[in-house]
From Swiss-Prot:
Active site: 489
Gene3D superfamilies in UniProt: 3.30.390.30, FAD/NAD(P)-binding domain
A Pfam family hit: Pyr_redox_dim
UniProt signal peptide: none
Note: The active site is a redox-active disulfide bond.
This protein's encoding gene: Trxr2
Protein name: Thioredoxin reductase 2, mitochondrial
EC annotation from Swiss-Prot or TrEMBL: 1.8.1.9
An example molecular function term from Gene Ontology annotations: thioredoxin-disulfide reductase (NADPH) activity
């Protein structure tokens, strides 16, 4: 069967089965459960709770395999425990350190000559918050009548799940009409000597007991850049090793601006470089050997910590998907538009699925919509287009829609107009902060009402700025509407309503003042 036929037929079957669920529910108990969810992260929990709210009998399995250095965590998945939440808290901690220095310029009597964070206290505070979220999550599952088992679960067949309730206990089995796989992913390690034994990942850094010190961050995706930036803001010495380009998949101009901002702030980059080995020295520090792939020259340097941020892999190896007949691509699960796998009653949501944005809000909404289709008669599918995202660096980068390169590739350079400009945040003037990289642009169609295809912004609180514009873009925002919108002054978000200079014009996009 061709891929297109598979997608069409499985989507149709998934929607047809969801519409018929209410009629079939009266035939219980053919299976032990109506829904078994594998994975207690954002997608799995959202799906499980929504399904239970629709009257389904739901069982959720969640299990965290410790990292090579022994890090483990509770229910909630990557976002709560080792992703979005601790990352944002560390980001905030680093911004507060910067704010202390700015406070002096604003008239506060603060001794900013010896500002230094207490790493252990910060980690303890972050972990205490995470544990409170773990507890609230468990209580929420109980209140919503979702059964929860903290155990690794695998497929016995397409309707049967096998698990061990506790180490040494006998294997148990449960059956379910539907199964949703939402096990997410974990960071990759490079296949080089010392990588696993001596390095850590984002799974470890937020609970790391000792100060990171001089840190080599290997990888220049958003995880690597965010970690490097909050470490720098907390007073440590990160270096970023880049194999090829920073922020692959993002707009190139914006990505390069972000890297330039980081360089200006004292974060060095090792460009076109790959690690070859990590060795522990007699003093306990780590010797990293590497090679520049452009010059073919070998080099080495010594660090206190090596953090791998070279991408993530789906956790499919322990699921026994072959027993269920579920098809995969690399380490991800292939699904159709209704999140159905190659087995019509088995679905997948979240980071485990192939070719979809790996973002928490995407996982949550797709999980809820799937539950509604299965148990509430809904036919609404998840719309994966034009999803906004933010890179939480000191000047944040947020975007929604197409990059400039994608727009040109899909529409042609002659059919694209790019409105752009630098700007000067008012609050930057008194502490004399650099505004060199505060920049935004709108990628639009050149003709007609000039529908906007993508919005990009580097600056303070980028996520807060772009969120509202994301809704506008989804509803067909045009350049005319944008420029006819009265901005809120003085804010950085209003800069989008003042975008009058196009790249094609060749005019200087640098403003003369904060109000020009």
């Amino acid at each position: 069967m061709s891929t297109i036929k598979f997608l069409r037929s499985s989507t149709h079957n998934a929607l047809r089965s969801s519409l018929g669920w209410c009629r079939l529910a009266a035939s219980r108990p053919r299976y032990d459960y109506d829904l078994v969810v594998l994975g207690g992260g954002s997608a799995g929990l959202a799906c499980a709770k929504e399904a239970a709210g629709c009257g389904a009998r739901v069982l959720c399995f969640d299990y965290v395999k410790p990292t090579p250095v022994g890090t483990k965590w509770g229910i909630g998945g990557t976002c709560v425990n080792v992703g979005c939440i601790p990352k944002k808290l560390m980001h905030q901690a680093s911004l507060l350190g910067e704010a202390v220095h700015e406070a002096v310029a604003y008239g506060w009597n603060v001794d900013d000559t010896n500002i230094r964070p207490d790493w252990r206290k910060l980690v303890r505070s972050v972990q205490n918050h995470i544990k409170s979220v773990n507890w609230v999550t468990r209580v929420d599952l109980r209140d919503k009548k979702v059964e929860y088992v903290n155990s690794m679960a695998t497929f016995r067949d397409s309707h049967t799940i096998e698990y061990v309730a506790m180490p040494g206990a006998e294997h148990r089995q449960v059956t379910s009409e539907y199964v949703v796989v939402a096990v997410g992913g974990r960071p990759r390690y490079p296949d080089i000597p010392g990588a696993v034994e001596l390095g850590i990942t984002s799974d470890d850094i937020f609970s790391y007991e000792r100060e990171p010190g001089r840190t080599l961050v290997v990888g220049a995706g958003y995880v690597g850049l965010e970690c490097a930036c909050f470490l720098k803001g907390l007073g440590y010495e990160p270096t970023v090793m880049v194999r090829s380009i920073v922020l692959r998949g993002f707009d190139r101009q914006m990505s390069e601006l972000l890297a330039a901002m980081m360089t200006e702030r004292g974060i060095p980059f090792l460009g076109t470089t790959i690690p070859k080995a990590v060795e522990r020295q007699a003093d306990g520090r780590l010797l990293v050997r590497y090679r520049n792939t452009t010059t073919q020259m070998d080099g080495s340097d010594v660090f206190d910590t090596v953090l791998w941020a070279i991408g993530r892999k789906g956790l499919i190896e322990d699921l026994n998907l072959d027993a269920a007949g579920v098809k995969t691509h690399d380490d991800k699960i292939v699904v159709d538009a209704a999140e159905a796998t190659s087995v019509p009653h088995i679905f997948a949501v979240g980071d485990i699925i192939y070719g979809r944005p790996e973002l928490t809000p995407v996982a949550i909404l797709s999980g809820r919509l799937l539950a509604r289709r299965l148990f509430a008669g809904s036919t609404q599918l998840m719309d994966y287009a034009d999803v906004a995202t933010t890179v939480f660096t000191p000047l944040e980068y947020s975007c929604v829609g197409m990059s400039e390169e994608t727009a040109i590739e899909l529409r042609g350079a002659d059919n694209i107009e790019v409105f752009h400009g630098y700007y000067k945040p008012t609050e930057f003037f008194i502490p004399q902060k650099s505004v060199r990289h505060c920049y935004l642009k709108a990628v639009a169609e050149v003709s007609g009402d000039q529908k906007i295809l993508g919005l990009h912004y580097i600056g303070p609180v980028a996520g807060e700025v772009i969120q509202g514009f994301a809704a506008a873009l989804k509803t067909g925002l045009t350049v005319k509407t944008l420029l006819n919108t009265v901005g809120i002054h003085p804010t950085t978000a209003e800069e989008f309503t003042r975008l009058s200079i196009t790249k094609r014009s060749g005019r200087d996009p640098t403003p003369a003042s904060c109000c020009s």
